[in-house]
Amino acid sequence: MTNVPWLTAIVLFPVSAGLLIPLLPGRGNHIVRWYALGICLLDLILMTYVFGCYYNLSDLPVQLKEDYCWIEILDFHWRLGVDGLSIGLILLTGFVTTLATLAAWPVTRNPKLFYFLMLAMYSGQLGLFASQDILLFFVMWELELIPVYLLLSMWGGRRRLYAATKFILYTAGGSIFLLAGLLTASLWGSNAPVLDFEILSHKSYPLGLEILIYLGFLIAYAVKLPAFPLHTWLPDTHGEAHYSTCMLLAGILLKMGGYGFIRVNMELLPHAHTVFAPWLVALGAYQIVYAALVSFAQRNLKRRIAYSSVSHMGFVLVGAGSLSDLGLSGAMLQMISHGLIGASLFFLAGTSYDRTRTLMLREMGAWASQMPKMFAMFTTCAMASLALPGMSGFVSELMVFFGMVTSAAYSPYFRAIITLIEAVGIILTPIYLLSMVRQMFYGSRISSVSVFNNIDAGPREVFVLGSLLLPMIGIGIYPNFALPLWSAKTQAVASLVQPTSILYSQTLYNIQ
């Protein structure tokens, strides 16, 4: 036990240090980028030290609790804590943000504002994953949008304003449902708002009301995940954003939707979850195949990778809807795995653009001989994305696959149909990924497009990709590097929905 407010320090340190950026000397980006990288690295070291020394993997309850009254009249507390659902995502946030800051080295336009926004986004994401108060969760959910919008609208492609506006409209629209859901959940059956996650988890609601609350939360999280049909902001956003911003979007922001769905919908509203679970499984399976087909039709490199993200996040829906411990644990691992893989692919897409000034696949070709290191790294990351054995994606998708197959909540016919659809999606994944690699690095050279900067990957790029590949391979070879972080918690959450799920499987959803 410790009385030191470690989590408050971890959450507030990046944005607090970022406020000092305007005081840094010089107009160039040399000092500010080293300063921002140092802040991210120090925060990553701090969280690693704190979790290593003070977090006990075998303890199920929330640990490192902090509770400070913020707005007394609303009973609004600065309430932080860490458990199995959040610790892995907090570490992922620190790791990916540090590498994204290093990836943003070439940014030269208004670097002070750029790096401050990255640090502010960093604090917002850490605060969301560490929140143990549902109103604080909402505040962090909203505050994190501001730096994302500015990063999208000020640094990116020609249609960046359109993409940023579409992003903010989708997410703000989803936030309305999130706010309505949390107000209803916190005020129901009490004279004062109940905002503590731990207390809310013991509240009960009439089933009809619980379903309405669940639906409001589901819409908000489906936008961020993203889930079909609320996914259309993602390809536009990734297509226009700077690749360091894309690393943060794919690596962390999408995981906010999956985390909120498991933390709130499953843990606080288990009865409603059993009602929606079959539909979530069906939606996730459809999304895996649909996004894979649409990805194959994309001719823009970043849009193809964006749709691959939509496809891979479908496994999170299937795992959460499987109502099994194995499936839910696989969904958690899928979020970690995709955070690493998505960040690596968008980084490679951006560094390729820096050299060629094109993202159109039809204008690429025969780059393998010119950039052999880039070719090797791109191919390796594509293999990780298509769930090659020995990579983290293989383990996570296999866990979701078997979690659905072995789920006692559904009939054999329903499980067989979903498994078949998932298998089709798994087969489609190498088709669009390997064709992408072929168009970029094989074939004939397009005469109208040449490599402007005919320099292969440098030490900085090799370091960023190597750092992302190490945990992908490590988890793929030995999954217990990551699984113990959340295994006890996912078992507890799955146990909340399994008893009632058996009843529902025998009545409403027993498809014969």
From Swiss-Prot:
GO molecular function: NADH dehydrogenase (ubiquinone) activity; ubiquinone binding
HAMAP family in alphabetical order: NDH1_NuoM
Organism of this sequence: Zygnema circumcarinatum
PANTHER family according to UniProt: NAD(P)H-QUINONE OXIDOREDUCTASE CHAIN 4, CHLOROPLASTIC, NADH-UBIQUINONE OXIDOREDUCTASE CHAIN 4
This protein's GO CC annotations: chloroplast thylakoid membrane
Protein family per UniProt: Belongs to the complex I subunit 4 family.
Subcellular location per the Swiss-Prot or TrEMBL entry: Plastid, Chloroplast thylakoid membrane
Protein name listed in UniProt: NAD(P)H-quinone oxidoreductase chain 4, chloroplastic
Domain of life: Eukaryota
A Pfam family matched in the record: Proton_antipo_M
Primary localisation category: plastid
Higher taxonomy: Eukaryota, Viridiplantae, Streptophyta, Zygnematophyceae, Zygnematophycidae
Transmembrane parts of this sequence: 4-24, 34-54, 87-107, 111-131, 134-154, 167-187, 208-228, 242-262, 274-294, 308-328, 330-350, 374-396, 417-437, 462-482
